[in-house]
From Swiss-Prot:
Biased amino acid composition, Acidic residues: 400-415
The organism of origin for this protein: Drosophila melanogaster
Domain of life: Eukaryota
Protein name: Brain-specific homeobox protein
Basic and acidic residues bias (residue ranges): 335-350
Amino acid sequence: MAMLNEASLSPADAHAHANATTPTHSKAAAMASATTMLTTKTPFSIEHILFQNLNSASNNNNSSDTNGIAANTNNYAPKSSRNAVKSARSAFAHDNNPHKHPSQHSHPPQSHPPASASASATATARSNQAASGYAGEDYGKSMHSTPRSNHHSRHGTSHYNGDQISQQLGSGAAQHPPVPTTQPQPPPPPPLNGGSGASNGVLYPNAPYTDHGFLQMTLGYLSPSSGTYKSVDPYFLSQASLFGGAPFFGAPGCVPELALGLGMGVNALRHCRRRKARTVFSDPQLSGLEKRFEGQRYLSTPERVELATALGLSETQVKTWFQNRRMKHKKQLRRRDNANEPVDFSRSEPGKQPGEATSSSGDSKHGKLNPGSVGGTPTQPTSEQQLQMCLMQQGYSTDDYSDLEADSGDEDNSSDVDIVGDAKLYQLT
């Protein structure tokens, strides 16, 4: 008992130790002597309280037989809990001054039955051990299961852990107030390498309609080797303006990727790139070009430059217009030969009557302009006709003109260049 007094045990623990068997008494005495060496002189320190709880837990484990019989008696359970509170308060009052009352530690008062006191102390110790044991075990499980279930939130894990602990503590929590256990939260789950599912929910969140791969994948008609047109769904043709922003066929803003995607082939792609804006001539420019063409079918380079400067056009525009006009003249001659009808090659003007037009002969080098007649009545030649007759009488030669060879294949390629300003039709008589 002297060693128990030095270890400052509670009265309930001392009484339980006195009722234990001889081997239990010897083991408890050895442990008490070992813990007495570690206690400090201050009875109110934290080490004093911790060693007191360890001694009571060891004594309760050694007297398991007596505690088991007392725990099975359900009739004394409420009384033992109330007596445990009273004994704890009395033990704290006696432990406050152990040096002033040494006799009280050696002879504690018997205020409750020994079986009930030991049962209450055992139940309290078991609840503390169970709470700490289950908390540690559950924390270990949560640490092991964290890498496997990263998609669960920490809030759900902590809620599940709290429910599991409350279910496992069972009857101990019903008889005694729950012991607040502060378990550390598991570490936050590492971020996924592949990114969250919300950000990857859409395949192409920002894919523009002008992307090459998007057009080829959507349309599915890619055939760059074919030179012919392919049958395409009309829906894609109607929606083609969404991609290029302009009508598709023959448009200046044609998209080459869309042309390939629709299966139009390399020829259509070349035509799409080659197509340019058509030149619009004004009425004075067209009048000057027509007058010069009626008097001269071919122009040399100096003459072409002079005419372009006088009309405010470029040399290329004048050359192209003359090429197209010659092709039109050939078509008119061919139509006249087939229908055996005279053709008026002059451009009809508001101040001119149709009968005043002249017709040219088949000889383009030395042919002379003869004034036409309507109904057999001759008409007086105008100043323009006189100028044309003077030009033709000079006998201009077309052997040294630079655009003579360029006119050889114009009949097949004449549809590439058009004249928008020449909207007036040539009359056929």
